């Protein structure tokens, strides 16, 4: 009888131990807080930088590539678009357009993000992109609160937003 009780206690202890260890491994660890360089802003796992110095689309993207290997911002969701719009508005800029990383490199109306991200979310302004317009680079427009995209000539000079991993 003593062996049966000892065996029962041993099995019970092992079951309790395995249950408590299972609970420990299922506990979610908090996401580490992203740290971005001074003068930039964090959103999710990226850092963002708004530059008010006007550049052509190509020069703006090169600037972003030289800044922590980033690109002009790719706006992949509505929530990210709202974040970028708030970042621009907080700067109190007078600019009517701000470059983003969307462009049509082959001029065939097939738009791509300079970062290589897939274009799944779209936020074109009414009438954009327009085949009547010779614009193959996209900007955010102030008249939409910087939430809508418009195709523009890549040679125009606008301020811009960079996006990069730190």
Swiss-Prot record:
Role: Might act as an inhibitor of spontaneous calcium carbonate precipitation. May be associated with neuronal sprouting in brain, and with brain and pancreas regeneration.
Principal localisation: secreted
Reported modifications of this chain: All O-linked glycans consist of Gal-GlcNAc-Gal-GalNAc tetrasaccharide core and get elongated (microheterogeneity).
GO annotations of cellular component type: extracellular exosome; extracellular space
SUPFAM superfamilies in alphabetical order: C-type lectin-like
Signal peptide: 1-22
Keyword terms of this UniProt record: Disulfide bond, Glycoprotein, Lectin, Secreted, Signal
PROSITE patterns in the cross-refs: C_TYPE_LECTIN_1, C_TYPE_LECTIN_2
Glycosylation sites: 27
Places the protein is found: Secreted
Species of origin: Homo sapiens
Highest taxon above the source species: Eukaryota
GO biological process, alphabetically ordered: antimicrobial humoral immune response mediated by antimicrobial peptide; positive regulation of cell population proliferation; response to peptide hormone
Gene Ontology molecular function terms on file: oligosaccharide binding; peptidoglycan binding; signaling receptor activity
Domain C-type lectin, first and last residues per copy: 34-164
Record protein name field: Lithostathine-1-beta
Disulfide-linked positions: 36-47, 64-162, 137-154
Residue stretches in coiled coil: none
């Amino acid at each position: 009888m003593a062996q049966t009780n000892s065996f029962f206690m041993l099995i019970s202890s092992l079951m309790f131990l395995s249950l408590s260890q299972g609970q420990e491994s299922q506990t979610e660890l908090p996401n580490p807080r992203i740290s971005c360089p001074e003068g930039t802003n964090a959103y999710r796992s990226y850092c963002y930088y708004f530059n008010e110095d006007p550049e052509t689309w190509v020069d703006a993207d090169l600037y972003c590539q030289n800044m922590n290997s980033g690109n002009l911002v790719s706006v992949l969701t509505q929530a990210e678009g709202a974040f970028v719009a708030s970042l621009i508005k907080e700067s109190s800029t007078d600019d009517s357009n701000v470059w983003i990383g969307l462009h049509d490199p082959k001029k065939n109306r097939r738009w791509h993000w300079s970062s290589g991200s897939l274009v799944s979310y779209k936020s074109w302004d009414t009438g954009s992109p327009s085949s009547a317009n010779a614009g193959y680079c996209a900007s955010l427009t102030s008249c939409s609160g910087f939430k809508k995209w418009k195709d523009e000539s890549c040679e125009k000079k606008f301020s811009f937003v960079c996006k990069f991993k730190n």
